[in-house]
Curated annotation (Swiss-Prot):
It is an enzyme of class 7 (translocase). Belongs to the ABC transporter superfamily. Phosphate importer (TC 3.A.1.7) family. It comes from Trichormus variabilis (strain ATCC 29413 / PCC 7937) (Anabaena variabilis). GO terms for biological process: phosphate ion transmembrane transport. Part of the ABC transporter complex PstSACB involved in phosphate import. Responsible for energy coupling to the transport system. Its main location: membrane. It is a peripheral membrane protein. Keywords: ATP-binding, Cell inner membrane, Cell membrane, Membrane, Nucleotide-binding, Phosphate transport, Translocase, Transport. Residues 9-255 form the ABC transporter domain. Its EC number is 7.3.2.1. Pfam families: ABC_tran. This is Phosphate import ATP-binding protein PstB 5.
């Protein structure tokens, strides 16, 4: 990793509350452009909460409060003047369980594009095909684009959700445990997809699977909790260093399987 590292997202002293209950505290880290950053840690340490703060989708879950800064290419996403819809187009999200819409495969991918722009049909067709190819799904569905997305396998549905995110051309893709509901073969396909997308996108992935983190990521952040069960980032670094020579004993205990 000798090339210059450019942060796509800079998180500075971030704390996040659901109502008045603090979920994560004092997190500072960079998510580098065209790199994959894994976020690991035991259940309940704030991994998913953290990743949802990066495009403000956490605000859909109820009243929240945020302290600190999340800088996205030079702009604080919590600035009250920010256009949240535009932000969420630039920072896409793939969730733990596949969530295809109850419509055709084609319309699933076209959905976000239709909302943001009125395009000629030929242009829309091209975007849908490109997104499905980007999600390594085109060859499997090109002859059944008008069939219901609900008829796809779980792994295909997850790649469809990735295609749906890719169609609106985000700069960053957030992935919250994207393989937890998938079988090993479907998981392998998603991991291969992550490898292929890193040249075009910045990716942050939450995973419980430490082997997956070592396979797909360039950088890793280890989260844990304090005595009050508030999530904190313990250590951040190059993935090989985090897993082979962590600096903090808590990280060492976690990656060696002593707790978590």
């Amino acid at each position: 990793m000798n090339q210059q590292l450019i942060p796509a997202i800079k998180v500075k002293d971030l704390s996040f509350y659901y109502n008045t209950s603090k979920a994560i505290e004092g997190i500072s880290m960079d998510i580098y452009r065209n790199k994959v950053t894994a976020i690991i840690g035991p259940s309940g340490c704030g991994k998913s909460t953290f990743i949802k703060t990066l495009n403000r989708i956490s605000e859909l879950e109820g009243p929240v409060k945020v302290e600190g800064v999340v800088d996205f290419f030079g702009q604080n996403i919590y600035d009250p003047r920010i256009n949240i819809n535009r932000l969420r187009r630039q920072i896409g999200m793939v969730f733990q369980r596949p969530n295809p819409f109850p419509m055709s495969i084609y319309e699933n991918v076209a959905y976000g594009v239709r909302i943001s722009a009125k395009l000629p049909q030929a242009d829309l067709d091209e975007i849908v095909e490109s997104a499905l190819k980007g999600a390594a799904l085109w060859q499997e569905v090109k002859d059944k684009l008008n069939k219901s997305a609900l008829g796809l396998s779980g792994g295909q549905q997850q790649r469809l959700c990735i295609a749906r995110a890719l169609a609106i051309k985000p700069k960053v893709l957030l992935m919250d445990e994207p393989c937890s509901a998938l079988d090993p073969i479907a998981t392998m396909k998603v991991e291969e997809l992550i490898h292929s997308l890193r040249s075009e996108l910045t990716i942050a992935i939450v995973t419980h699977n430490m082997q997956q983190a070592t396979r797909v990521s360039d950088f890793t952040a280890f989260f844990s909790t304090d005595e009050s069960r508030i999530g904190q980032m313990v250590e951040f670094g190059v993935t090989t260093q985090i897993f082979s020579n962590p600096l903090d004993s808590r990280t060492r205990d976690y990656v060696s399987g002593r707790f978590g």
